[in-house]
Amino acid sequence: MRLPVLGKDTVRMRDPEGLQDKITRIQRGGQEKLQIISDFDMTLSRFSRNGERCPTCYNIIDNSNIISDEGRKKLKCLFDIYYPLEIDPKKSIEEKYPLMVEWWSKAHDLFYEQRIQKDRLAQVVKESQATLRDGYDLFFNSLYQREIPLFIFSAGIGDVLEEIIRQAGVFHPNTKVVSNYMDFDDNGILTGFKGDLIHTYNKNSSVLKDTEYFKEISHRTNILLLGDTLGDLTMADGVSTVENIIKIGFLNDKVEELTEQFLQSYDIVLLRDETLDVVNGILQFVTAKN
């Protein structure tokens, strides 16, 4: 039986029959064996609304009044240089890797110069255009109610990401976030970022020093992985035993050029789909009691 939600016109599948087999196997395993691993920016959050681009965690800071006009220009200049390289279909991940380190490092240096205050972040998020994808409440709340762990692995800013989810009223105890977290001094002024830099193309076990999380849930060998770049495909590398994994890719930009590449790697590719309908549909099916 094919799930009706997979008939949506935004859905592309590499191997519909193989996918259905995986869905059935995950359903048989039950919710006790399931975990979710997801990217945040442009995966759980929207890419656009009414034709306007929605901001990433970094954009929220870049575009806010806690950054000077001069700082904003410099950050925009970095975006204009590096974003096209990040999504360039002709460049390999190996070529993109050092470029992403450059971009993130330069952006962080600009942030330090701005002496960002911790107590202003909540207001900055509130005033931003950041929006979670339609269906986010069902997604976060049903995972919490069913005690299914949600691991968010983000190259964004952890403090901002958490605030977005908190302000939406869906930040629950089953959610664990690994991201770039800001480090503040005793006066609440940004002095740096904690731990290793996480960027688009190193979201793998190399930055997951704290794998205690995956050890604790090692019995959860079925995974739904959600991402929006080819760099997100390695997010489950920290899981020691994987029985079944369904990879769902949100293809938001350069759709025509990247569809084929995405289909080689993701089981399901969602073309310009600003909802979590497909994810929620699969979750409802695999966690149904009968």
From Swiss-Prot:
* CDD domains per record: HAD_5NT (cd07504)
- GO biological process per UniProt: nucleotide metabolic process
**A molecular function (GO) term:** hydrolase activity
What residues bind CMP, as annotated?
86
The catalytic activity of this protein is classed by the Enzyme Commission as 3.1.3.91, 3.1.3.5
* One cellular component (GO) term of this entry: cytoplasm
Which residues does UniProt mark as catalytic? 39, 41
Compartment annotation: Cytoplasm
Key words, A-Z = Cytoplasm, Hydrolase, Magnesium, Metal-binding, Nucleotide metabolism, Nucleotide-binding
The keyword Magnesium appears for this protein: yes
Catalytic activity from the UniProt record: N(7)-methyl-GMP + H2O = N(7)-methylguanosine + phosphate; CMP + H2O = cytidine + phosphate; a ribonucleoside 5'-phosphate + H2O = a ribonucleoside + phosphate
Sites binding Mg(2+) sit at: 39, 41, 228
- UniProt: N(7)-methyl-GMP binding residues: 86
Task: Determine the domain of life of the protein's source.
Answer: Eukaryota
Annotated SUPFAM superfamilies: HAD-like
Tagged with keyword Transcription:
no
Tell me, what's a Pfam family for it? UMPH-1
Task: Tell me, in a sentence or two, what this protein's role is.
Answer: Specifically hydrolyzes 7-methylguanosine monophosphate (m(7)GMP) to 7-methylguanosine and inorganic phosphate. The specific activity for m(7)GMP may protect cells against undesired salvage of m(7)GMP and its incorporation into nucleic acids. Also has weak activity for CMP. UMP and purine nucleotides are poor substrates.
Assembly information from the UniProt record: Monomer.
- By what name is this protein known? 7-methylguanosine phosphate-specific 5'-nucleotidase A
